[in-house]
């Protein structure tokens, strides 16, 4: 079956309609209008103008569809046939006489819509329209809350035994069990070969403090280190107890012989004649005499064994000679005098310790005065311990001799004081807010105990 295009079908319908209208016999049999309208032959005879007044064919019942693309090549032969028929139908028509006007023809189809005119004014509010049709069903709603659980149903029958599952993972480690009984002691193994010496291990952690051991022998004196900072003066200590009296020293040398006494009074006259006999031998030496070491002995002076200043005054039994500070500290004799060879000075022992007797000597006794001007020339010569070429008494060389504690000159950077040389320090500057006089210890440290604060 041949399927025709809608446009081609419309054209065929028009041609079919025209062919039917052109047959007068068919029209008369269907619509008897011969009385009302003259036939085509009558119009041809009536005048030559009748042919020219033929009405155009009616418009098609179905308007052709609108095609945006080009025309189909199938329509070209039909259109050519239509044009040929129209030319053949109009070519023999001769202009005839004007006939009577015919009846009005049927109303044609509505024309194409015109252009949209300008927007008119807003009309009155119309009546409310009818109720529209129900819309499409809406989207299903969200599920509601879970309802209460229903009653528990009857228990079902036991199902068939399932297949054995895979082995599970290893469980956690259990708790440690109780220790077992101690086994029997094994036999002693053979002694193995001596292994190679291992590397030295790291030093271990310090152990616990052990008990204090016995005091070992005194070592050799070490090198003098740097002097530390001066500490704050401590509080005055309590008065110590008086020590035991020392051992009686050896007796002194016998003193010089005394002056001969005055001659006694003459004896009674002898009964007979006095004859001078020969001189006798020299007698044995007498005991050593007593030395009071004081003023001339008389009846007002005390006898030997008593102090010149009374029985309560202390006495100095003997003078010791030491080489250095260590030997001086070993002497425990109370109220004694010692001579230090290294410093060439005397020290006295009382309740406070060993104190120098010569506080501010200009120079030791064996210091020789420079008579030739050789000391201070910077050249070390016989008899000089040092020669720094200056006259500064605050360094380690004073008048060509080494400085030491007790020479009366403060060695800067080494000694806090020396004798009465405090380096321009007083109680006011050493302890602000105090007053009094500073003291210098036998070790050339400042003693601020005499300083007092205002109350």
From Swiss-Prot:
Molecular functions per Gene Ontology: extracellular matrix structural constituent conferring tensile strength; heparin binding
Record note on modification: The triple-helical tail is stabilized by disulfide bonds at each end.
Q: Where is this region: Heparan sulfate proteoglycan binding?
A: 130-133, 235-238
Coiled coil spans: none
Composition-biased stretches (Pro residues): 101-112, 134-152, 262-271
Protein's cellular compartments: Synapse
Q: Does the keyword Transport apply?
A: no
- Tagged with keyword Transmembrane helix: no
Q: Name one GO biological process term.
A: skeletal muscle acetylcholine-gated channel clustering
Cite the residue spans of the region called PRAD. 51-67
The record ties this protein, via InterPro entries, to: Collagen, Collagen_superfamily, Myxo_disulph_rpt
Q: Spell out the GO cellular component terms annotated for this protein, sorted alphabetically and separated by semicolons.
A: basement membrane; cell junction; collagen trimer; collagen-containing extracellular matrix; extracellular space; neuromuscular junction; plasma membrane; synaptic cleft
**Family the UniProt entry places it in:** Belongs to the COLQ family.
Q: Which disease is it linked to?
A: Myasthenic syndrome, congenital, 5: A form of congenital myasthenic syndrome, a group of disorders characterized by failure of neuromuscular transmission, including pre-synaptic, synaptic, and post-synaptic disorders that are not of autoimmune origin. Clinical features are easy fatigability and muscle weakness affecting the axial and limb muscles (with hypotonia in early-onset forms), the ocular muscles (leading to ptosis and ophthalmoplegia), and the facial and bulbar musculature (affecting sucking and swallowing, and leading to dysphonia).
Q: What is known of its domains?
A: The proline-rich attachment domain (PRAD) binds the AChE catalytic subunits.
Q: What does this protein do?
A: Anchors the catalytic subunits of asymmetric AChE to the synaptic basal lamina.
Fill in the subunit field for this protein.
Homotrimer. Component of the asymmetric form of AChE, a disulfide-bonded oligomer composed of the collagenic subunits (Q) and a variable number of asymmetric catalytic subunits (T). The N-terminal of a collagenic subunit (Q) associates with the C-terminal of a catalytic subunit (T).
The protein depicted here goes by the name Acetylcholinesterase collagenic tail peptide
Organism expressing this protein natively: Homo sapiens (Human)
Q: Which gene encodes it?
A: COLQ
């Amino acid at each position: 079956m041949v399927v025709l295009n809608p446009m081609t079908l419309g054209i065929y319908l028009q041609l079919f309609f025209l062919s039917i209208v052109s047959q007068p016999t068919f029209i008369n049999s269907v619509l008897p209008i011969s009385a009302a309208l003259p036939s085509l032959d009558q119009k041809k005879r009536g005048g030559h103008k009748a042919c020219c007044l033929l009405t155009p064919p009616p418009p098609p019942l179905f308007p052709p569809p609108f095609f945006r693309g080009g025309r189909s090549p199938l329509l070209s032969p039909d259109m050519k046939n239509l044009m040929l028929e129209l030319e053949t139908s109009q070519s023999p028509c001769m202009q005839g006489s004007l006939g009577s006007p015919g009846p009005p023809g049927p109303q044609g189809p509505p024309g194409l819509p015109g252009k949209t005119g300008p927007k008119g004014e807003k009309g009155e509010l119309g009546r409310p329209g009818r109720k529209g049709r129900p819309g499409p069903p809406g989207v299903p709603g969200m599920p509601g809350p879970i309802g209460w659980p229903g009653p528990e149903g009857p228990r079902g029958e036991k199902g068939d035994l399932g297949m054995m599952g895979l082995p599970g993972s290893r469980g956690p480690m259990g708790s440690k069990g109780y220790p077992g009984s101690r086994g029997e002691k094994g036999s002693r193994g053979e002694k193995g070969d001596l292994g190679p010496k291992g590397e030295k291990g790291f030093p271990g952690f310090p152990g616990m403090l052990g008990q204090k051991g016995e005091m070992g022998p005194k070592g050799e004196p070490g090198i003098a280190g740097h002097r530390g900072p001066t500490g704050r003066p401590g509080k005055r200590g309590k008065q110590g107890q008086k020590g035991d009296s020392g051992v009686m020293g050896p007796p002194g040398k016998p003193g010089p012989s005394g002056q001969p006494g005055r001659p006694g009074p003459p004896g009674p006259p002898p009964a007979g004649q006095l004859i001078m006999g020969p001189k006798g031998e020299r007698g044995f030496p007498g005991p050593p005499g007593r030395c009071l070491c004081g003023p001339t002995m008389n009846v007002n002076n005390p006898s030997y064994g008593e102090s010149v200043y009374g029985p309560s005054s202390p006495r100095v039994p003997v003078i010791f000679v030491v080489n250095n500070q260590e030997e001086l500290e070993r002497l425990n004799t109370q109220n004694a005098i010692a001579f230090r060879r290294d410093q060439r000075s005397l020290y006295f022992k009382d309740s406070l310790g060993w104190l120098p007797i010569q506080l501010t000597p200009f120079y030791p006794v064996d210091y020789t005065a420079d008579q030739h001007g050789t000391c201070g020339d910077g050249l070390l010569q016989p008899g000089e311990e040092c020669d720094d070429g200056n006259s500064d008494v605050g360094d380690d060389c004073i008048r060509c001799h080494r400085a030491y504690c007790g020479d009366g000159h403060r060695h800067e950077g080494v000694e806090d004081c020396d004798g009465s040389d405090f380096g321009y320090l007083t109680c006011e500057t050493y302890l602000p807010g105090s007053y009094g006089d500073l003291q210098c210890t036998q070790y050339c440290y400042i003693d601020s105990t005499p300083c007092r604060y205002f109350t």
